[in-house]
Amino acid sequence: MKVETPVSGVGLGLRRALMGPLSQARDYAPESIPFDFMEVAPENWIPMGGRQGKEFRAFTERYPFVAHGLSLSLGGPEPLDFELLKSVKSFLKQHNIRRYTEHLSYCSDHGHLYDLMPIPFTQEAVYYVADRIRQVQDFLEQPIGIEHVSYYAQLGNAALGAQMSEIDFVNAVLKEANCELLLDVNNAYVNGINHGYDPLDFISALPGERICYLHIAGHFDEAEDLKVDTHGSDVIDPVWALLDHAYQTFGSLPTLLERDFNIPDNATLFAELRKIGGYQQLYPSAAIKSEDWQKPAQP
């Protein structure tokens, strides 16, 4: 299987706390840098100017980037925020960002909820959110990817209104919206433990031809049967095993490490990135870059 992807290799999510340490790493020999692309949440960087804005520009001139949105609220009841999308579209163009992705969730209901809330697994919700995804793709004039989110309510319970399983819901949205998938391996693990399904089966049932890239991250063990997606710790062995399974199923695909806090030193962080690369080398690449990356034009 071959998949047209916007980037290739190993990725790292850029956080402000990483800018200093990674700026030092820019002086390393290129072959010692264990990542090939980076990801940012546009809401955190669009308004940035001054010194930090220049530092950010230095990163986008050096590496291919993708953008992962936080606040579009694709499943929310309020109209889509086209002012935000206008800013996102300009941001993508300014920094030659290769793909925009968002969460299959909602985060606003007459005000921002400051969390990513899951969408009910119903046919009505499939049609509703798919229509909004198509509107976003039309406005941005490019495909977008959606990420299946971690959730903690029993949304798959028919007694609570569920009409389908999580995997059937995700696949129905992908087909109806004709969009791409951001496969989050840690979310599959967390949801599998919390809701009693096999994450191996979940990943195997996804349409590999729609995957634009993957996320991998750490989580918090609240209890044996309750895991919380935090991006604040090292990736554990069962999640690495799921990544290996994804590569066995689909072939090696671009994969990005998310680390939001408790950020370790470069040596420790780079070791996890190299581990991703090690798994990728075990399998034939399934990725075909959609176009060659070029340095962003100067403003």
Curated annotation (Swiss-Prot):
InterPro entries reported in the protein's UniProt record: MbnB/TglH/ChrH (IPR007801), Xyl_isomerase-like_sf (IPR036237)
Pfam families tied to this protein: MbnB_TglH_ChrH
Transmembrane segments annotated in the record for this chain: none
Family named by the database record: Belongs to the UPF0276 family.
PANTHER family recorded: UPF0276 PROTEIN HI_1600
UniProt protein name: UPF0276 protein ABO_1518
Organism, scientific name: Alcanivorax borkumensis (strain ATCC 700651 / DSM 11573 / NCIMB 13689 / SK2)
Classification of source organism: Bacteria, Pseudomonadati, Pseudomonadota, Gammaproteobacteria, Oceanospirillales
